[in-house]
């Protein structure tokens, strides 16, 4: 069986990544592509690297007929996404890649994103889309909220450790190095090549990054009490990838065993041998996440290091993984291609 797919926000980086991934999928066919400023253009005009694909032209979203669409990916910015999704047919399956439906508490959304939520009905039904931990809920969901790429990285590192109680919850420091594509495709002065190249810097310092809302929500739920981590992201002059380092209080060997057992049967999460650390180069363009554990020289302290591609496992790949579950397709379909190298 072939399912008809629409992608809204198809002219951005995550939209392009969805097109690339679905092009190799045996059960999905892209029948509609929505955009705003680039509506009316062909995919070849917007993304020359995809010109060999037989795809529809980009349309204004209100021009799309959703009657025969089986599932819609929404890759629009937050705030815009909730407005668009609220107007879609109420029985249409949707995977949202924005931040609009990740936080269950409307007050938390307003705190982190600066505006009141305008689609509370949809927010209440949304399922958090961290696939490996919400698999059963995702299978029956109508609306799935994709995680933030930073939030996904940190949770793959820490969730099993919090559940198992093998780390000090009041002493978690998370440092992430993030590629520039995570900031989107729109023109920003600080993201120009001459402004970004040959250096990197911390941003959203003082634990102010919006993805902390997801960490607070998910880690506190796991622990059964409030958990607040210290988190600082850094912008690096790379196109793809996130490298996360967690500084933790706990026994390194026990931490490694816990992660290895938690992910033993997960097709996309690979825990490296004890003492090895991952590289973003080894997951580039793939839906894989590599995790390593190293003992610190201080007794009772450990490092957990994770690498994933922010556009794939951190966003569009995870979205496709969720869509597979929602449509009762094999979860790994279209996602097992190896990373790009070099």
From Swiss-Prot:
Record bears the keyword NADP: yes
Top enzyme category: oxidoreductase
Catalytic activity, as annotated: N-acetyl-L-glutamate 5-semialdehyde + phosphate + NADP(+) = N-acetyl-L-glutamyl 5-phosphate + NADPH + H(+)
SUPFAM superfamilies assigned to the protein according to its UniProt record, in alphabetical order: Glyceraldehyde-3-phosphate dehydrogenase-like, C-terminal domain, NAD(P)-binding Rossmann-fold domains
Superkingdom: Bacteria
Functional description taken from the UniProt entry: Catalyzes the NADPH-dependent reduction of N-acetyl-5-glutamyl phosphate to yield N-acetyl-L-glutamate 5-semialdehyde.
Name of the molecule in the record: N-acetyl-gamma-glutamyl-phosphate reductase
Organism the protein comes from: Roseobacter denitrificans (strain ATCC 33942 / OCh 114)
Phylogenetic placement of the source organism: Bacteria, Pseudomonadati, Pseudomonadota, Alphaproteobacteria, Rhodobacterales
